[in-house]
Amino acid sequence: MARIAGVDLPKKKRVEYALTYIYGIGLKSSREILEAVGISFDKRVHELSEDEASSIAKKIQQSYLVEGDLRKKVQMDIKSLMDLGNYRGIRHRKGLPVRGQTTKNNARTRKGKKKTVGSK
């Protein structure tokens, strides 16, 4: 099992799909990496040599923000929105949908379990 960017890649999958197991790398960027390094998309992870795996890891480290660093950056971006106190930051702080979705009937995932308010 190849280990790239702190993630164990599944042995039997094709490399282009296995790289998507790394947080921050999708199918498009995985194909760009393989093209830049010169490895076939059809190759399986267990068929990779040590040199190929290290060249992939080197390319990812040079060009992409992945795993913990990317998660940290996303959290910092959200925190800065909340500190600024703009609309998106307030929505994050309140735990409501940020991108303009309606909240009258839906948004249960974001709002949590229904809190019934009794009336007299």
UniProtKB/Swiss-Prot annotation:
Q: Which PROSITE patterns match?
A: RIBOSOMAL_S13_1, RIBOSOMAL_S13_2
Q: Which GO terms describe its molecular function?
A: rRNA binding; structural constituent of ribosome; tRNA binding
Kindly state which keywords UniProt assigns to this record, in alphabetical order: Ribonucleoprotein, Ribosomal protein, RNA-binding, rRNA-binding, tRNA-binding
Q: Where is this region: Disordered?
A: 93-120
Q: What GO cellular component entries does it have? A: cytosol; small ribosomal subunit
Q: Where is the composition biased (Basic residues)?
A: 107-120
A Gene Ontology biological process noted in the UniProt record is: translation
Entries under SUPFAM superfamilies matching the protein: S13-like H2TH domain
- What NCBIfam families would the database entry show? uS13_bact
User: Can you state the subunit structure given in the record?
Assistant: Part of the 30S ribosomal subunit. Forms a loose heterodimer with protein S19. Forms two bridges to the 50S subunit in the 70S ribosome.
Annotated family: Belongs to the universal ribosomal protein uS13 family.
Q: What does this protein do?
A: Located at the top of the head of the 30S subunit, it contacts several helices of the 16S rRNA. In the 70S ribosome it contacts the 23S rRNA (bridge B1a) and protein L5 of the 50S subunit (bridge B1b), connecting the 2 subunits; these bridges are implicated in subunit movement. Contacts the tRNAs in the A and P-sites.
Q: What is this protein called?
A: Small ribosomal subunit protein uS13
Species the sequence originates in: Helicobacter acinonychis (strain Sheeba)
